[in-house]
Amino acid sequence: MNDSELKACLESIVDPELGRPLGELGMLRQATNIDGTPRVLIELPTPAYPRQDRFQGLVDDAIRSQFGNTPAAQLDITWNVKGNESGGKIGLRVKNVIAVGSGKGGVGKSTTAAMLAYGLHSFGAKVGLLDADVYGPSIPHLCGAGGEPGVTEHRGADGNVMQRLQPIEKDGLKLLSVGFLVKADQAVVWRGPMLHKLLTQFMQQTDWGELDYLIVDMPPGTGDVALTLSQLLSLAGAVVVCTPQKVALLDAVKAISMFDQVKIPVIGIVENMTGDIFGRGGAREHAEKTNLPFLGEIPIDKSIRELGDAGRIADVLSDACPVRDDLLTVCQNIAMQVAKEQLESPELPTLEIL
């Protein structure tokens, strides 16, 4: 077996999650035969790829079915998040911007957004969390973060000096919220143009660095923020959060309609607070009716409320938290759905950064 034969053999393996050959997906990065032992490198499209240990068996079975009894392959697995830098000419270097929205308040949207951000970070991704709920910012409290964003000066290619906000960093996440700019008990009473200006600054004049995912906590309902984001960015998509009962589902339908109208693709639906109090399965049923992916359930559990109240929402990822596995499954489903869309979409040309 030479290297070309080995490569051709492995390129035909069908990815168990994406349903396409590794060669077609560009995931086989190396295949060499060194003294009779296959050396293989596979690059996954996200660190949140589920059950990565399956690849050892898939690789060994493919090699042995074609070349007979051979030593087990020395398999290395790496990852590179797929995505198109979403900022275009505003200079935001983020591979995937994901909006988290709902049709109404009270369904745990902000808590879910924060948990998703920390969940994706726990797999090794570089993640930011933007609180776009300007009238009711809760991300600073949920994450236990405080202080004011710093300001640094950058000199552009034209020689002009620009000021950029520095996100607050907490437990590995980069955070930004109007809650860092006003007192905790101060209401933000702004009209739409002021809201648009602030969000533009949060995107265009903030030093986010290079991120794999930027999670945007949307305000409840439908309105200005979705319009602003659709005008500024090319989003990977939106996650709609709702609870199982019908009254929440009715408003989730409106959120889905809003994202459709502003040309933001809907990644799928997450059912939050699943359990005996609110019931279960309503979001899954609606996802099936609308042909949208159902991304999973997050059970109703007092630990989420306690950790959020204490400013320790990151601790939902601790082994002791009863919802940890459910949350990680939702994160994996979101990451894989985004990866599927990116792999199926043609690459966009790189835009000039002004």
Per-range role (PLM):
Residues 10, 28, 63, 94, ...:
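Residue-level signature of catalytic and energy-coupling elements of molecular machines
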Residues 310-324:
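C-terminal boundary of histidine-terminating zinc-finger modules
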Residues 120-185, 196, 203:
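Phosphate-binding loop that captures ATP/GTP phosphates
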Residues 24-27, 32-101, 331, 342-345:
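Extreme N-terminal, non-catalytic leader segments
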Residues 205-208, 212-310:
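Conserved catalytic-core segment of NTP-binding enzymes
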